[in-house]
Structure formats: structure tokens, C-alpha cells
């Protein structure tokens, strides 16, 4: 071939042929910043497993109880059909949860060697002093079956109750740990390598409330993992991957989400929207992969909701049962409107999204901190939708990323609003219910602030991480001051520190070294992550190619691993089509 001759052109000697372009670019490592952010995210959750004594997570007593019931071979239960286990009642009743009259440092607790197992405290016998049934029976069984598997491991049934709870918590930690990595991979699939993908990966590390929820026994954590995993193949769908096996993967992950929690019932809308937009963007019908996704998801998780309709004549029954549900709801008290409810909803969701530290609220970050973070996230995501991801229907494609979070928030709004109009209650308004949609929001936020930052967009990951670490420092300082500092040490900084460390060691299920190791890891990894972010801002990077406005042909789809390889080389693909 002569210099400057394009492949496929004709010369005097005949058509020129060329070797097909390599569609598999060299594999790249995950950026150091994303590895550091993921490690820091893990360390923060590990720290929270110690900062929060057993059963201080939201509804943690009942999540542990249901996992314990499944470990005994019981369940699923009808509404109102699961009384609290006597063993759970005994060990929970012996604690001051949350601290009522003072910090944990001043509350009595059994020495570590004298704490009984759940089995030794009464096992699965019916609770004697707590008559209210376990409401968690309304949830699908997957999370509890996973946790039950941990409780059935050899020797676990004989461990002290706080170590049993700690092991269950670590299952949650491992579920939420990959979130920064998955957010980065999803963003990179859509917009390529660069500051935008790094920003998306850093955002999950900025939420103290996420560190808290990820460190306790709660089925939200399985939903967070399932939806974050689902975002990655949906990003492939939006970029033209309409293969049947990708549809099967989408269906599998959607089905697992449906087996995690009822909030997942909004996800089929997001999946259908992604395939519809992919049809418009790439002008290829996705009916077969979409049908495969529907069938697989129904077989994996959709059956649970059909079962509810058949047995209980409703999609999700009240887990308390009719009698207790009516008692807890209370009598009607008219006079309130949806307009009255909206600002109350916004304030509570804002406080519990970036905050959500206590049980249920105190200690609490200032409203301007939690509200400022949430406003910034929403504003950045809206700009990200306006910018789009490039190519045909780019704004529509970007908007599908927000659908899970919007759907979760809409369900919360409707459920709590109905109760508020009925008699003024504000139940179920928790930021953790929206965390499963955080991956899509992180990508949109990163796109938006990247556009707003212009040439300074390279600094965004560093600034975001620094702001997030300051928020964490503020949050955990509040928690330690209220929960762990002995009252008699207030005013003496040295005594405050020694007293808090001593109290944490006393309440911990573990000896001193594993108790303090997560705190040391956070102290070490925080500057390491900041250094990695600073190096990422200084290191020049080639700009990612703009997504082609032309629809990608099926031949342009490859099987590369999104977590290990960059986006396809647009120039090579254009050459191949000539």
C-alpha cells in the first residue's frame, strides 16, 4: 500500500487490501485513584462496623432476626407470621440502643468473653416481651438467604451475638464495596476515560450515610449492588450492544434486584427505556434481547411478586399483617394536603441522604451541608442530562441513567405522602432507599460538572474527594462526640480521645488490633486517595474521542471487559467501514 492510500481503495494494481483493524485495544489498568477510592470506601464501612454497636443500624434487629429464621430452615412467612426470636430479644434487650441517657462510654456492657450467642440466649423460641411481628417478612428472600448461609457456617452458631452480627455486616460491606469501581466503569463505557469517569467513581466515597448503611445488616445493600451491576450492561446497550447474551445478563441482574427489595419494581421501566433509546440511537430493533431480558428476570425474581398477588392479592403486603398494620398506622386525621407534605419530604430526605448517621437521625449534620450536597448532585445530574452522552438521542440516553433514582424517590414520595395526608405521619423517608440509583446519578453528575468545569474539569475529582473527606470528618466527629466520649472527660482533649478509644474497644466484638485497624486504614488511605487524585489532575491525558453520531453496526460490538479495557477506537472502526 502506498503512503496515504486508504484501505479498500482501488489503484492501478487493483484493490488494496489491509489487515482488519485490531478491535481489542491494549488492556489498561484501573486508575490508581479508583483503586484508592474503592479501598477508602471499604475502610470507611469497616470503621462503621465498629462505630455502630450491634443492632444500631436501621431495622437491623429485624433483618438479623429474619436471617436467623432462614438459617433455621423457616420462611418465607405470611404477613404477621414471624414473631421475633427469643434469642434476639434477649441480647437486644440487654443493650442501650441507641444511647438514651448518655454515650455508650457511660453505659454498661457485658465483657467480651461473656456475651452469649443468639442460640444460647434463647434461640428461635418466641419472644416473651415483644409481641410485634417482624415486618421484614414483606421483603423477598435473597438477602436473608445469603446471610443465613453465613450463620450456617461451621462454628458461627456458637459465636457471641455481636460477632455473629459483625459477620453479617461484613456481607453487606462486601456488597457495597465495588460501588466506586462500578460507577467509574459505567461512566467510562459511556464517555471514555478521563476526569468524567474518575469523578463518577469518586462520588460514592463522599456520602457518610452510605458508609453507615453499607456497614450494617440491611437488604438495601443487596439492591445497591444489583442495580450498580445492572448499570454496566445497560451502558453497553446504550452504546449499541444489542446481543441476546447481553439481554440475558440484563435479565439476570434485574431478576436478582427483584429478589432483593420491592423498590426494584421500578427497574423494568428503566430497562425498557434503555432498549428503546438504543433502538432510536442505533436503528436496530432490540425486541429479541429485550424479550430475553424479560423472560430471564421473571424466572429469576419476578415470580416472587406474582406469588404475592396469588397468595395475598397484592404486590407487596404489609409485613406486620392487617391487625398490627392498622394499629401502627393509627386513626385518620384529615386536614393535611400533598402541598404541605412536599417541603417536609424534601427536608427529611435531604437530611437522611448525605447524613443518615443516627438512629434514626441524631447526630445530624447541619441542614446546609446535607442540603447543599443533594442540591449539587441534582443540579449536576440535570446538566449531565442536558449535555447527553453524544451521538443520536444523547440526551434521551443520559436521562435513562436517572430513571432508577427517580423511580425510587417517586415510590418513597407516594408512600409517605399517602400516610401524611391520612394522619400526618412521615414514614419511610430514608436516603438509603435512593442509594441503589447512585451509580446513574454519579455518571450524570460527573458529565454535568465536567462540562461546567470546562478546562478546569480535570480538577473536579480532587476537589470532590477533598470535600467528601471533610464531610466524613465532620460526620464521624459528631458521632464519636455524642456516642463515644465519656461525659467526665469533656474539656480535656487527651482524656476525650483516650476515653472514646477505650469505649469503642470495650463495646467492639473484636480484640484491639482488628478493632482499631479500620481507623488506621482510613487515616492512611485518605491522603493516599488525595495524592492519587492530585496526580490524576497533573498527568496529561489524551481526550477521549467523541461518540460517533452514526449508529454502530453489530460488527463493532466486542466482548471486552468493561472493567479492564477502554472504549472502542472510533477511528479504527471508521476505517473498517470504508
Q: Which residue ranges define each predicted feature?
A:
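Interfacial juxtamembrane loops and adjacent helix segments
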Residues: 72-168, 326-328, 359-363
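Hydrophobic, aromatic-rich transmembrane alpha-helices
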Residues: 351-402, 445, 462, 522-540
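Membrane-interface alpha helices of multi-pass inner-membrane proteins
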Residues: 246-262, 267-268
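Transmembrane-helix signature of polytopic, membrane-embedded enzymes
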Residues: 32, 159-162, 183-206, 458
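Membrane-lumen/periplasm interface segments of multi-pass, membrane-embedded glycan/lipid transferases
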Residues: 305, 309-388, 497-519
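Transmembrane-helix motifs of polytopic, lipid-linked glycan transferases
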Residues: 163-190, 229
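Transmembrane helical bundles and short interhelical boundary loops of multi-pass, membrane-embedded
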Residues: 363-369, 456-547, 551, 572-578
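Perimembrane helix-loop-helix junctions
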Residues: 239, 267-297, 388-389
Amino acid at each position: 500500500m502506498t503512503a496515504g492510500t486508504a484501505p479498500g481503495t482501488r489503484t492501478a494494481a487493483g484493490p488494496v487490501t489491509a489487515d482488519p483493524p485490531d478491535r481489542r485495544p491494549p488492556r489498561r489498568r484501573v486508575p490508581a485513584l479508583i483503586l484508592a477510592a474503592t479501598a477508602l470506601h471499604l475502610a470507611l464501612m469497616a470503621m462503621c462496623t465498629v462505630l455502630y454497636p450491634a443492632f444500631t443500624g436501621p431495622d437491623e434487629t429485624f433483618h438479623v432476626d429474619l436471617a436467623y429464621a432462614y438459617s433455621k430452615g423457616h420462611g418465607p412467612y405470611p404477613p404477621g407470621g414471624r414473631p421475633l426470636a427469643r434469642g434476639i430479644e434477649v441480647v437486644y434487650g440487654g443493650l442501650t440502643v441507641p444511647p438514651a441517657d448518655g454515650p455508650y462510654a457511660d453505659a454498661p456492657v457485658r465483657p467480651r468473653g461473656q456475651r452469649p450467642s443468639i442460640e444460647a440466649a434463647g434461640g428461635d423460641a418466641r419472644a416473651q416481651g415483644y409481641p410485634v411481628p417482624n415486618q421484614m417478612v414483606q421483603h423477598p428472600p435473597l438477602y436473608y438467604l445469603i446471610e443465613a448461609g453465613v450463620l450456617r457456617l461451621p462454628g458461627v452458631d456458637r459465636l457471641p451475638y455481636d460477632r455473629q452480627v459483625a459477620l453479617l455486616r461484613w456481607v453487606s460491606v462486601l456488597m457495597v464495596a465495588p460501588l466506586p469501581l462500578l460507577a467509574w466503569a459505567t461512566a467510562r463505557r459511556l464517555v471514555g476515560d478521563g476526569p468524567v469517569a474518575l469523578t463518577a467513581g469518586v462520588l460514592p466515597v463522599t456520602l457518610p450515610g452510605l458508609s453507615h448503611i453499607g456497614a450494617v445488616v440491611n437488604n438495601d445493600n443487596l439492591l445497591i449492588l444489583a442495580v450498580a451491576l445492572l448499570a454496566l450492561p445497560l451502558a453497553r446497550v446504550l452504546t449499541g450492544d444489542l446481543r441476546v447474551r447481553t439481554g440475558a445478563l440484563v435479565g439476570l441482574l434485574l431478576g436478582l434486584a427483584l429478589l432483593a427489595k420491592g423498590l426494584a419494581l421500578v427497574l423494568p421501566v428503566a430497562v425498557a427505556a434503555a432498549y428503546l433509546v438504543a433502538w432510536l440511537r442505533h436503528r436496530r430493533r432490540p425486541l429479541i434481547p429485550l424479550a430475553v431480558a424479560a423472560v430471564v428476570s421473571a424466572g429469576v425474581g419476578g415470580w416472587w411478586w406474582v406469588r404475592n398477588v396469588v397468595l395475598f392479592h397484592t404486590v407487596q403486603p404489609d409485613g406486620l399483617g392487617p391487625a398490627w398494620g392498622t394499629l401502627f398506622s393509627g386513626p385518620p386525621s384529615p386536614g393535611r394536603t400533598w402541598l404541605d407534605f412536599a417541603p417536609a419530604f424534601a427536608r427529611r430526605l435531604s437530611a437522611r441522604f448525605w447524613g443518615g448517621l443516627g438512629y434514626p437521625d441524631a447526630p445530624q449534620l447541619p441542614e446546609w451541608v446535607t442540603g447543599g450536597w443533594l442540591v449539587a448532585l441534582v443540579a449536576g445530574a440535570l446538566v449531565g442530562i442536558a449535555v447527553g452522552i453524544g451521538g443520536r438521542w444523547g440526551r434521551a440516553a443520559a436521562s435513562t441513567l436517572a430513571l432508577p433514582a427517580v423511580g425510587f424517590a417517586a415510590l418513597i414520595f407516594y408512600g409517605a405522602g399517602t400516610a401524611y395526608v391520612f394522619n400526618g405521619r412521615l414514614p419511610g423517608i430514608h436516603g438509603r432507599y435512593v442509594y441503589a440509583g447512585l451509580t446513574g446519578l454519579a455518571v450524570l453528575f460527573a458529565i454535568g460538572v465536567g462540562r461546567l468545569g470546562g478546562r478546569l474539569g480535570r480538577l473536579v475529582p480532587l476537589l470532590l474527594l477533598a470535600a467528601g473527606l471533610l464531610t466524613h470528618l465532620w460526620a464521624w466527629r459528631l458521632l464519636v462526640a455524642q456516642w463515644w466520649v465519656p461525659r467526665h472527660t469533656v474539656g480535656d482533649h487527651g482524656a476525650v480521645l483516650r476515653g472514646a478509644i477505650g469505649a469503642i474497644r470495650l463495646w467492639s466484638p473484636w480484640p484491639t488490633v482488628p478493632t482499631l485497624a479500620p481507623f488506621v486504614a482510613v487515616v492512611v488511605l485518605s491522603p493516599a486517595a488525595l495524592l492519587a487524585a492530585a496526580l490524576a489532575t497533573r498527568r496529561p491525558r489524551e481526550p477521549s474521542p467523541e461518540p460517533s453520531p452514526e449508529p454502530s453496526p453489530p460488527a463493532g460490538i466486542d466482548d471486552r471487559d468493561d472493567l479492564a479495557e477502554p472504549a472502542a477506537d472510533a477511528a479504527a472502526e471508521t476505517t473498517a467501514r470504508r
